[in-house]
């Protein structure tokens, strides 16, 4: 598709991620570390609540299984992320061997090969972020669409991230981002997201009787 903006003489060729609803009030163009350009459109839309359901579910967040639900379903972490992670390690090792400043005050300039390798690393980081975001969006939408009430363990993620053995795994899993998605989607569609004590077996409750 194409997009016309005031500061550009020619229309911009764009790939739409979704259909825009409502009247657009502002447009923001940004560029990420992988040299990709994004256009963010702000519009106001009335979101209709979904039909009321009788089903509820309790979920626990984990690392081996990303979500463990009380109805017996387990959702594994995205495999694509692990695949990209292996590629990222190789590229980062190659990057470290290229000419660049290696400590504070080092004036060694970045070589052309270093800059090229750095862009490759940024692109893989972007692919990981895109894959993870897509996974979280789809799973959060599925849970919200299929359940009227979702009970979730109230985790102290900030405290857990201080644990060096867990910090990277928790950050990679994006627990906070997933919970945020559940919160705003529950508000949009008239669902209830209830936080319970970490000692309450939320994934062991009956999904039909609660």
Each predicted region: which residue ranges?
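Short Pro/Gly-enriched beta-strand edge/turn motifs at strand-loop
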Residues: 8-14
């Amino acid at each position: 598709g194409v997009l016309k903006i005031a500061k550009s003489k020619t229309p911009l060729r764009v790939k739409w991620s979704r259909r825009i609803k409502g009247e657009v009030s502002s447009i923001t163009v940004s560029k990420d570390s992988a040299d990709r350009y994004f256009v963010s459109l702000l519009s106001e839309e009335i979101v209709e609540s979904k039909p009321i359901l009788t089903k509820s579910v309790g979920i626990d967040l984990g690392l081996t299984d990303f979500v463990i639900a009380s109805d017996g379903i387990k959702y594994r972490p995205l495999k694509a992320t692990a695949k990209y992670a292996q590629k990222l390690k190789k590229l980062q090792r190659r990057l470290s061997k290229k000419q660049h400043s290696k400590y504070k005050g080092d004036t060694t300039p970045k070589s052309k090969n270093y800059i090229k390798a750095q862009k490759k690393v940024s692109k893989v980081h972007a692919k990981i972020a895109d894959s993870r975001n897509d996974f979280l969006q789809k799973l959060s939408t599925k849970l919200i669409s299929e359940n009227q009430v979702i009970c979730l363990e109230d985790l102290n993620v900030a405290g857990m991230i201080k644990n060096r053995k867990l910090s990277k795994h928790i950050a990679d899993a994006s627990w906070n981002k997933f919970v945020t998605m559940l919160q705003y989607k529950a508000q949009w569609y008239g669902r209830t997201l209830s936080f319970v004590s970490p000692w309450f077996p939320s994934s062991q409750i009956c999904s039909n009787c609660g």
